[in-house]
Amino acid sequence: MRHVRLIAALVATVLAANAMAGHHEKPEHNALIIQADFEGMVMAGVAKSVSKKLEVFNVRPLISLYDIRAASETLAYNAQTWPEGTVFVSVVDPGVGTARKSVVLETKNGLYFVSPDNGTLSGVADAYGISAVREIDETVNRRPNTEWAHTFHGRDVYSYTGARLAAGVISFEQVGPLLEPEVIQLEISAGTYEERVFEGQVAGGVDRLGNIYFNIDRELFERDKPEYGDIYEIAITNRERIVWEGAMPYAKSFGAVAVGENLLFINSSGLLSIAINQGNFAEANGIGYGADWRISARKRR
């Protein structure tokens, strides 16, 4: 009986030790997130060929062709809820095959971003800070037997390197040589508030619902001491030509106004935005985005 109790105690000790070890053990694989301006299933296939256990997620909807600004904004937005160790691959690469660098950026909160250094990484650099940047060493971090291919680095370099990093095949240090902790920045000016008038640009883009958002953040907007129901007079211009002009209420959310009505609101990224409740404001009014698209907003007193 004494031996039985001793064996039981030993088994309990081993099980407890294993449980503690399992509790502290890091996951073998991290998630891999792929965004691109084309269908990314081929890149997902490359990732799965590195490890069948790898969790791969494709961002939908696709980024508009060659739209580096949208890639930067989307990448920064989607990264905000993912845990430390997650690897993101972004392939919006109009300069593929040229001298632009292929890099992996590590943020200060432990996320990894694999991309051409063409402005795509400016959003995550601003949002999360840069811990380190490494240039991908293609002599070791390139899909085998693709050295001859120069127009599909998303498949042959970025998804392959990202998958190897996420699966633990390579460490961040094995990506390649360390670079200066900086990336190419997109030129996005900050919104302003002077003499009770907001000025900004449709810098963030137009989302899939046709809502448009500006480089006027919540903190800047609150300088006007807005209250829900306040009416704002809005003008949207393209190269100084007025494209849309009118007034709308500042609202908490879409349902605060009738279906088909316009509203001004703060979106989930904390940016001043315009929408039509259950409609597409951008499509209905021919609104685009970029540095040439400007907005002015003034509260009706």
PLM regions with names:
Residues M1-I7:
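Bacterial N-terminal signal peptides that target proteins for export
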Residues I7-N18:
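Bacterial N-terminal signal peptides
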Residues G22-H23:
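Boundary of Sec targeting at the N-terminus
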Residues P27-L62:
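N-terminal glycine-rich anion-binding loop in soluble enzyme alpha/beta folds
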Residues H29-A31, S51-E55, D67-E73, T81-V92, ...:
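Active-site histidine-anchored catalytic micro-motif
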Residues D37, T161, N277:
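A residue-level signal for conserved active-site and pocket-lining positions in enzyme catalytic cores
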Residues P144-Y228:
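Anionic-ligand-binding alpha/beta catalytic cores of soluble enzymes and soluble regulatory domains
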Residues Y213-G286:
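A conserved acidic, glycine/proline-rich C-terminal tail/linker
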